[in-house]
């Protein structure tokens, strides 16, 4: 079965995915996305589509799991895709089950985002914040502190372009990478 699940991982050219990361199920990874070693992406209840320019750090867990009240053995629920937009950052040790996420969001270290939360764009979920409500988080919302207080920032967070460029250069020097899809044919020099 491990053979079958590995084949459904699609990595776009230009993405940097370390071999030490764990990716299971039907996962599509967009270009310029960087996935650190020990990051986990698990698609068990449906596919996960990750857009362009995302940064997924060590021990981050992105999981499309079955809701607590459904077990895959008893019922055959229709698979629901998890869609992640562009330029999102999943910091060290965060846990995300959000089924829909826009662009330019940051989930900070040890933060938890539940399955029924929809992140729009430009949101920051602060370190150690636990967000497990049925709601759509408005654009540019910052959730912070031990009490998960909220405020709206005037601008959305800057994309991590320089950090992505740096990691795309450095990670291949120290880690083996997973192969990308053969999208473009490059001539081989003899």
From Swiss-Prot:
The PTM Phosphothreonine maps to 186
Which is an annotated GO molecular function term of this record? dynein complex binding
Signal sequence residues: none
- Annotated compartments: Cytoplasm, Cytoskeleton; Chromosome, Centromere, Kinetochore
InterPro entries referenced in this protein's UniProt entry, alphabetically: DCTN6, Trimer_LpxA-like_sf
Quote the PTM field. Answer: Phosphorylation at Thr-186 by CDK1 during mitotic prometaphase creates a binding site for PLK1 that facilitates its recruitment to kinetochores.
Instruction: Kindly state which keywords UniProt assigns to this record, in alphabetical order.
Output: Centromere, Chromosome, Cytoplasm, Cytoskeleton, Kinetochore, Phosphoprotein
Q: Name one GO biological process term.
A: mitotic spindle organization
Tissue specificity here reads: Ubiquitous.
Q: Where are its TM segments located?
A: none
Q: Which family does it belong to?
A: Belongs to the dynactin subunits 5/6 family. Dynactin subunit 6 subfamily.
Primary role: Part of the dynactin complex that activates the molecular motor dynein for ultra-processive transport along microtubules.
| PANTHER family, per database record | DYNACTIN 6, DYNACTIN SUBUNIT 6
Assembly and partners?
Answer: Subunit of dynactin, a multiprotein complex part of a tripartite complex with dynein and a adapter, such as BICDL1, BICD2 or HOOK3. The dynactin complex is built around ACTR1A/ACTB filament and consists of an actin-related filament composed of a shoulder domain, a pointed end and a barbed end. Its length is defined by its flexible shoulder domain. The soulder is composed of 2 DCTN1 subunits, 4 DCTN2 and 2 DCTN3. The 4 DCNT2 (via N-terminus) bind the ACTR1A filament and act as molecular rulers to determine the length. The pointed end is important for binding dynein-dynactin cargo adapters.
Specify the protein name. Dynactin subunit 6
Species in which this protein is naturally found: Homo sapiens (Human)
